[in-house]
Design a protein with these regions (language model features):
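Conserved catalytic or regulatory cores that recognize and/or transform ribose-phosphate-containing ligands
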Residues: 1-147
Length: 147
């Protein structure tokens, strides 16, 4: 079985690449998907539907267009990894974790110890909490093992 892993959350560090490189080095049977990680492109996803004067409606259109991708990829993944960084509030990541929890999709949270308290409910529904991308790779190695 090839596992599909959805990588959600923080876009300002290379955690995604670290996980991908780690799984490739081990030859794990996984493929990856993700939301659009280019911030400006994501913010402008709804611009093709017409110009908006109010920022709310531009954001609303872009959120809807982005949700086409996100919802489809989350529904089709086997497991999600949801990364919370310490610099920005990742509302999208929290939403993805909630979606996974509500739909019974297993997910791993990835974040530093300093933000355990604000994420206690998110972590409470997660199958695992990792502090490093290497720990995520170790979990993926274990769960994808054929023996």
């Amino acid at each position: 079985m090839i596992w599909t892993v959805y990588l959600s959350g923080e876009i300002h560090t290379d955690w995604r690449q670290q996980i991908i490189r780690g799984t490739e080095a081990l030859g794990l049977p996984v493929t990856f998907s993700s939301a659009v990680t280019h911030h400006e492109a994501s913010d402008a996803a709804g611009d093709m539907l017409g110009e908006e004067v109010a920022g709310f409606w531009r954001d609303h259109k872009s959120a809807k267009v982005n949700a086409i991708r996100t919802k489809s990829l989350l529904e089709n993944c086997d497991i999600a990894v949801v990364r919370f960084g310490d610099k920005y509030k990742q509302w999208n990541a929290a939403f993805d974790a909630g979606y996974c929890a509500a739909s019974g999709k297993p997910y791993i949270t990835l974040h530093d110890e300093q933000i355990i308290h604000p994420l206690k409910e998110v972590d409470g529904s997660a199958m695992a909490w990792a502090q490093t991308p290497d720990q995520v790779v170790e979990i993926l190695q274990y769960v994808t093992a054929s023996g």
